[in-house]
Amino acid sequence: MRIVITIGGSILLKEYDNKKFEDYAKIIRQINEDHEIFIVVGGGRPARDYISVVRDMGETESICDEIGIQVTRINARLLQLALKDVSYPAIPVNFQQALEFSATGKIVVMGGTEPAHSTDAVGSILAEYVGADLVINATSVDGLYDKDPNKYNDAQMFSEVSADKLMEIVSDNDTKAGTYEFIDKTAIQIIKRSKIKTVIVNGNTPENVKTAITQPIGTLITE
C-alpha cells in the first residue's frame, strides 16, 4: 500500500530530545518493509512559540503561517535524519517534489506547504496527489471527539465518523496559525472528495501507527 502518515509536531517534540524521533524511525522502518511511505510532520510547540513572537510583532496571519511552515520543515528534517538511509535526504517543499523524490524508492518526509493549511490538510492533499491508499494521522489524543477532550471530561470519542459530521463539529473553529484543535476544513473536504481511508490514532505510542494499517484503532473517517 501507499500510505501517508501525518505526525503532529507536539508528538515528536514533547521534550527537546531525540527519543521520539528515534522511536518513530524504528516503527516507520518496519512499515516501510511492506509499504510505500510518505510522512508529513507538524510544527508543535516550537512553531507555536515562534508564531507567538511574530504575532506580537503585529505581523499578519500569513506571515505567522510562513514562520510555522519553516519550523515544520526543520522538524521533518530531524525525522528524516533519524530514518537515515531509508529516507530521501531532502525535504520537499511541494507535492510535485514529494512525488518525484518517492520515485527513488525512499521514504519521503515533508513539512508544511501553504499558508492556512494544517498538518492534516497537507497530509490529505498529499495523499490525493500521490494516490495513497491510506492516511494515518498521529495526534496527541486517542481519536476524534465531539469536543476537546483536554478541556471537557464528557467529550465523546468517535470510533467512526463521517466527513459531513466532522465538518459540523469544526465549523466554528478559527484558522489562526498554530491553533488547529481538531482536523481542519480543508482536510475534511479532501477526505470526502478523494474517498481515501483516513484513521486518527494516538501518536504518543508510535506502535499505534503500525496497528492502524491492519486493525481497528482510534477513529475512522468515512466519506
UniProtKB/Swiss-Prot annotation:
CDD domains: AAK_UMPK-PyrH-Pf (cd04253). The keyword Kinase applies. Keywords: ATP-binding, Cytoplasm, Kinase, Nucleotide-binding, Pyrimidine biosynthesis, Transferase. InterPro entries: AceGlu_kinase-like_sf, Asp/Glu/Uridylate_kinase, Uridylate_kinase, Uridylate_kinase_arch/spir. It is found in: Cytoplasm. GO terms for cellular component: cytoplasm. Pfam families: AA_kinase. GO terms for biological process: 'de novo' CTP biosynthetic process; UDP biosynthetic process. Catalyzes the reversible phosphorylation of UMP to UDP. HAMAP family: PyrH_A (MF_01220_A). PANTHER family: URIDYLATE KINASE, URIDYLATE KINASE PUMPKIN, CHLOROPLASTIC. This is Uridylate kinase.
